[in-house]
Amino acid sequence: AGSMDSCSETGVCMKACSERIRQVENDNKCPAGECICTT
């Protein structure tokens, strides 16, 4: 398992999130190219 698609905590912006844990509607709160974690 790669650490790139795991989230350390909810609401954290990451460079790479797996589709099942990202919250697309909140990606705009993150820097460009990053996604927000929801788990």
Swiss-Prot record:
Disulfide bond sites: C7-C30, C13-C35, C17-C37
Coarse class of the protein's main subcellular location: secreted
UniProt key word Secreted: yes
Keyword vocabulary terms for this entry: Disulfide bond, Ion channel impairing toxin, Potassium channel impairing toxin, Secreted, Toxin, Voltage-gated potassium channel impairing toxin
Residue(s) at site: Basic residue of the functional dyad: K29
Localization, UniProt: Secreted
GO cellular component, one term: extracellular region
Expressing tissues: Expressed by the venom gland.
A molecular function GO annotation: potassium channel regulator activity
Keyword Disulfide bond on entry: yes
Domain of life (superkingdom): Eukaryota
Function: Voltage-gated potassium channel inhibitor. 1 uM of the native toxin inhibits rat Kv1.2/KCNA2 (100% inhibition), and drosophila Shaker IR/Sh (100%), human Kv1.3/KCNA3 (83%), rat Kv1.1/KCNA1 (32%) and rat Kv1.6/KCNA6 (21%).
Family note: Belongs to the short scorpion toxin superfamily. Potassium channel inhibitor family. Alpha-KTx 31 subfamily.
Domain notes: Has the structural arrangement of an alpha-helix connected to antiparallel beta-sheets by disulfide bonds (CS-alpha/beta).
Other observations noted: Negative results: does not inhibit rKv1.4/KCNA4 and the sodium channel rNav1.4/SCN4A.
Entry protein name: Potassium channel toxin alpha-KTx 31.1
Organism name: Buthus occitanus tunetanus (Common European scorpion)
